[in-house]
Amino acid sequence: MTVGKDFLLNALLKENFFPLQKKKREELPPVFTSSDLTKTVAEDIRKVALSKDRKKDGFDSIQYKTIRFNNVPRLLSIPHPKPYIDICFEIYDYWDQVKHICLNPNSLIKPQTHKSGRTVIMDYEASFVKRSRYYKFAFGKKFLAHADIANCFPSLYSHAIPWALVGFSHAKNNRSNSEWFNKIDKCFRSCSRNETSGVPIGPAISNIACEIVLERIDRELCKQFNYIRFIDDYTAYCKTHEEAEEFIRRLSIELMKYKLNLNIKKTAIEKLPQAINDEWVGRMREIIPKDKEIISSKVSDILDAAVRLQKVNPDGSILKYAANSIVHKLNDDSSVEFTKYLMKLCFHYPILIPILKEPLARVHKNKSDSYRRELKLLIEESINYDRSDAVCWLLNYFIIRFLYRLLI
């Protein structure tokens, strides 16, 4: 099913402007929102005339760093509203020529109609969906081919968008800015200082640009291979090792047509069968009680186990999994224990900071004062390491828990 153009525009303007890619919106505190950027407001902004210099130089984005489970930062972007709005309306105006990307069976992340009002959510699928797909795709196959595009969004060539939309020949023979596909290309360039290389990482418009190009590649590859794609990450199910090698070879050839390349470090062929989930997932499921309120003494047992497993599996987001699994099962007493333990872990694993939101809110006001020092130290540490997301969340907590109380 395709996305309706009115829903799409509303989602792009009001829900998918900020880099809120995950279902839980953990990249930014809720104070960051574009909910007031309605179609009417956007139309007024779109009418603003630009100077010659601004048209020539384009616009830049605000760089925003989010921390991954291995503490390696990921660079996201908050685009300038003017060129972003221009892109949204160009996609809206020509959605009939673009909406086919919603029907791509090989892509797991594409524009959809989500209940949250967003059109793009870049989360991994539910475990039961993952299992069902594995049972279906892996039957009769002996090998998995894994491949990943190197620096996909920063490397995406803006001219590749027209190539994918109307074909190489037609795009290269019709270069007028009045052509609808070139209008989209031009708007994306304006969002990135009029450069042809790279699109902002984070807003849904970038996912749409990526899907336009990669859907065209999928059309060619799906004729011969059985595979799925999670944004820029490919998994092919193959009968022979030779077929797996051929998939990687063909994928590389198709990508190069659009000036994209494979990430050699993430290209691999593995023999089936493979476990559906990592070993640590099963271990954590054994430890965490199902549908039970977690008491204070159990909190430390669960988080202790997660710390030990994290050390053995540094590439897994075990602590985040454990914390998210129990945060909604706490009572008032265990919330205090959880907050104390998680606060200490946040100093070493800042990816956990957004999870503090709920337990901090439950902690009694008198007890919350004891976290003032910890929050200040975490803010200082996050500033020193230029952790944008951590600083935003911590300042949000600090203002809500302490400064706001001084004003009322």
For each feature predicted by the language model, list its residue ranges.
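General structural signal for secondary-structure boundaries
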Residues: 1-10, 80, 228, 256, ...
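Conserved two-metal-ion catalytic palm core of "right-hand" nucleic acid polymerases
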Residues: 1-178, 183-201
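Short acidic (Asp/Glu) and glycine-rich catalytic loops that position anionic groups and cofactors
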Residues: 65-68, 280, 373-375
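Short, surface-exposed, charged/polar-biased interaction segments
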Residues: 104, 108-115, 168-174, 255, ...
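Conserved polymerase palm-domain catalytic core
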Residues: 132-231, 236-248, 292-408
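Polymerase palm active-site segment centered on the conserved acidic dipeptide of motif C
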Residues: 241-301, 308
